């Protein structure tokens, strides 16, 4: 953008601020609140101008966000809100998305550290894998680089974790199905060396024993993908289940496909509950009953914690768990048992 007087005035008018404030945002000098900066940047975007280049500007931290594949809508949702929240706080994001067989989380981490990243956010990463080597996280703490994790609390990781209450979500889903008269309930979830999947399986086992006296509940472990869940659902149909709780919305969609392919109906023959409440789940036919992850609340708290560390030069090198309560969203994929 050419910072002539006319364009600066346009932006100032659009944002409801003075031209001097716009100039401070462009030049990275002076005191500008995060909210005012956001309004100025929004005005720049809406008017079609180029944003000021952030490199070299003071008080503009660069935050690395490492997420799994964005083809899973829940990870796309986390990424969207993280980028929005970091931008609102006056930072710049470097987003690294993993895909199977491509660049790994720790490869991304090495590259970001070389770029002198100011802080890091890991979403459902290796920190959530009970089989993973956690040394890179310890190295981050030793370097004094603040970071937080999302959805995968492990006490060995020296950073705060912000996660959905998986156990409460599963308990809520089972209770809903029991109220509908179901007793042949199965859990279709992820591999239990992944912390959220383990929490779901543990909660399912406990609540089925408490409420039904079932000490050997039906649990199918597989990958958190549409295809893997579709394949595993055949076994659940063969075992005569009347309801399936999936560990993710993608798994729920895979289960529904297999149920339909078998000539059965959701929810008339088999009820299905998802987990995430990701984008478009309310627009399916039938709309998916699911456990809603409080993504925005998790993101807001995680980013606030990271920025507090950046502001105080505290390195967050102590583990802490922050658990956020999920909600059951009842839609059309569950019904009374026959």
Regions found by a protein language model. Name each.
Residues 1-59, 338:
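N-terminal helix-turn-helix DNA-binding module of bacterial transcription factors
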Residues 3-7, 41-80, 89, 100, ...:
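N-terminal helix-turn-helix/winged-helix DNA-binding helices
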Residues 35, 67-77, 95-104, 126-129, ...:
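Hinge/beta->alpha junction and helix N-cap segments in small-molecule ligand-binding domains
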Residues 104-117, 227-239:
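Short, well-structured alpha-helical segments in soluble
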Residues 106-117, 121-168:
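Short beta-strand-centered segments that line the small-molecule binding cleft or hinge
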Residues 183-184, 214-217, 266-271:
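Short acidic capping loops at alpha-helix termini that bridge into adjacent secondary structure
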Residues 235-338:
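Flexible loop/turn connectors
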């Amino acid at each position: 953008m050419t910072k002539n007087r006319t364009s600066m005035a346009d932006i100032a008018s659009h944002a409801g601020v003075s031209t001097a404030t716009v100039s401070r945002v462009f030049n990275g000098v002076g005191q500008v609140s995060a909210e005012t900066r956001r309004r100025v940047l929004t005005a720049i975007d809406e008017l079609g101008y180029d944003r000021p280049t952030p490199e070299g500007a003071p008080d503009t931290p660069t935050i690395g966000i490492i997420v799994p594949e964005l083809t899973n809508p829940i990870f796309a949702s986390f990424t969207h809100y993280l980028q929005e929240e970091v931008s609102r706080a006056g930072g710049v994001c470097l987003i690294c998305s993993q895909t199977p067989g491509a660049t790994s989380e720790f490869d991304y981490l090495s590259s970001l550290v070389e770029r002198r990243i100011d802080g890091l956010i890991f979403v459902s990463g290796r920190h959530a894998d009970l089989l993973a080597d956690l040394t890179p996280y310890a190295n981050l703490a030793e370097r004094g680089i603040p970071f937080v994790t999302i959805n995968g609390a492990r006490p060995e990781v020296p950073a705060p974790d912000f996660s959905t209450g998986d156990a409460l979500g599963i308990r809520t889903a089972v209770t809903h199905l029991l109220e509908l008269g179901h007793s042949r309930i199965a859990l279709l979830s992820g591999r239990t060396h992944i912390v959220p999947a383990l929490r779901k399986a543990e909660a399912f086992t406990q609540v089925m024993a408490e409420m039904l006296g079932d000490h050997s509940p039906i649990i199918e472990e597989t990958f958190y993908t549409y295809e893997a869940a579709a394949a595993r659902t055949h076994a659940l149909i063969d075992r005569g289940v009347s309801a399936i709780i999936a560990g993710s919305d993608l798994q729920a969609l895979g289960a529904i496909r297999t149920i339909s392919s078998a000539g059965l109906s959701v929810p008339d023959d088999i009820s299905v509950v998802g987990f995430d409440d990701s984008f478009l789940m309310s627009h399916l036919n039938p709309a998916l009953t699911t456990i809603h992850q409080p993504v925005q609340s998790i993101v807001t708290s995680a980013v606030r914690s990271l920025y507090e560390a950046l502001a105080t030069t505290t390195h967050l090198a102590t583990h802490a768990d922050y658990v956020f309560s999920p909600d059951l969203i009842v839609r059309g994929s569950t019904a009374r048992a026959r």
